[in-house]
């Protein structure tokens, strides 16, 4: 339980919800299906940036970043389905809701708000080819 709290506190402190920042450097990315050797290990993820579905034409996206071992230099960044990332962390936080700090309770509220902002109507209006899922190597 303590490890989950530490992980959430260190990794999720940097969550940014960007509903109106269309000029942020490449907030909309392509989600690719990666082979196992190209996946980021959960314990190596240092930052997770969530992009609102209103920023990327109805798509909820997330950027998962991992630094080079022993440095602050970003070497790996992966694009992910933001709705899945948000759902995963909501599930973890709700399982341990009685032990959450006020900061993590606030994070849970923010994540639930972001999750609630997603609608099928947004996706139906999206250009599905713009951020199409690609099979990667």
From Swiss-Prot:
Signal peptide bounds: 1-25
GO BP term, pick one: symbiont entry into host cell
Highest taxon of source: Viruses
Bilayer disposition of the protein: Peripheral membrane protein
Region annotation Interaction with gH: where it falls in the sequence: 23-128
Gene Ontology annotations for the cellular component aspect, listed alphabetically: host cell Golgi apparatus; host cell plasma membrane; membrane; viral envelope; virion membrane
Locations listed in the record: Virion membrane; Host cell membrane; Host Golgi apparatus, Host trans-Golgi network
Record keywords: Disulfide bond, Fusion of virus membrane with host cell membrane, Fusion of virus membrane with host membrane, Glycoprotein, Host cell membrane, Host Golgi apparatus, Host membrane, Membrane, Signal, Viral envelope protein, Viral penetration into host cytoplasm, Virion, Virus entry into host cell
Cysteine-cysteine disulfides: 28-56, 29-79
Spans through the membrane: none
Main location: virion
Family affiliation: Belongs to the herpesviridae glycoprotein L family.
Quaternary data: Interacts with glycoprotein H (gH); this interaction is necessary for the correct processing and cell surface expression of gH. The heterodimer gH/gL seems to interact with gB trimers during fusion. The heterodimer gH/gL interacts with host EPHA2 to facilitate virus internalization and fusion.
Protein purpose: The heterodimer glycoprotein H-glycoprotein L is required for the fusion of viral and plasma membranes leading to virus entry into the host cell. Acts as a functional inhibitor of gH and maintains gH in an inhibited form. Upon binding to host integrins, gL dissociates from gH leading to activation of the viral fusion glycoproteins gB and gH. The heterodimer gH/gL targets also host EPHA2 to promote viral entry.
Protein name: Envelope glycoprotein L
Source organism of this protein record: Epstein-Barr virus (strain GD1) (HHV-4)
């Amino acid at each position: 339980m303590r490890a989950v709290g530490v992980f959430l506190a260190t990794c999720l402190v940097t969550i940014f919800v960007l509903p109106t920042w269309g000029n942020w450097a490449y907030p909309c990315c392509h989600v690719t299906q990666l082979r196992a050797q190209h996946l980021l290990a959960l314990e190596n993820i240092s930052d997770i940036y969530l992009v609102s579905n209103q920023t990327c034409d109805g798509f909820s996206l997330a950027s998962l970043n991992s630094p080079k071992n022993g440095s602050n230099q970003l070497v790996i960044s992966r694009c992910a389905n933001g709705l899945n990332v948000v759902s995963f962390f909501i599930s973890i936080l709700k399982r341990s809701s009685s032990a959450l700090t006020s900061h993590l309770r606030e994070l849970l509220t923010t994540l639930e708000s972001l999750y609630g902002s997603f609608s099928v109507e947004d996706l139906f209006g999206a250009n599905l080819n713009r951020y199409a899922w690609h099979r990667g190597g």
